[in-house]
Amino acid sequence: MRAWRAYAWWLGLLALAPLALPLALYTRRTALRLPPAGGELCGVAGEHLPGPPLRLLVLGESTAVGVGVERLQDALVGQLAAALAQRSGRPVTWRVCGENGITAVQAQARLLPQALEQPVDLALLVFGVNDSTHLTSLARWQEALAGMATALQAHGAQVAFSSVPPLQHFSALPWLLRRLLGWRA
């Protein structure tokens, strides 16, 4: 079933390429590009709580680096760390290894060595949007995620994965691209 969907997607893209390619190039040229959040790439949530801190790593693309917010405390990593501190009753030290626009394959080569420099208890891998827009094959995407997860687990981390957001609802994309990328994601 999965292979059928992949073939259908590529056939649909081929048929719609005369419309989709100019639209994609125009969107890439004119889309609003927001900077990553400012501030330190590490922090502490629940520092007043007792006990040894839980060490959290968020590794990934634009969501990981807080694109769209001013401070990382307001981004995914800061909110996740605060929630973990509240639920666990212990402090959470957090850090981010990420890059706006990076794919999982690129991150495995460029960001994973940096991510492994310090001990981690819990790692969240945040990938999928850029892999969808860069047309990374499902096999290469899964292989890169598995490689990063295996390396992090070998260093003692528990690993979690975020889901790929519903690209079909991204209002910044024209209708045709939303449909194609949403189907692919």
Predicted regions and their residues:
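Residue-level detector of flexible, active-site-proximal loop/helix-junction positions
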Residues: L25, R29, G101-T103, P166
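Alpha-helical cap/lid subdomain in secreted, periplasmic
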Residues: R110-A185
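Generic structural signal for beta-strand residues in well-ordered domains
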Residues: H48-L49, R87, L116, L152
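N-terminal secretory targeting modules
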Residues: M1-L57, E70, S88
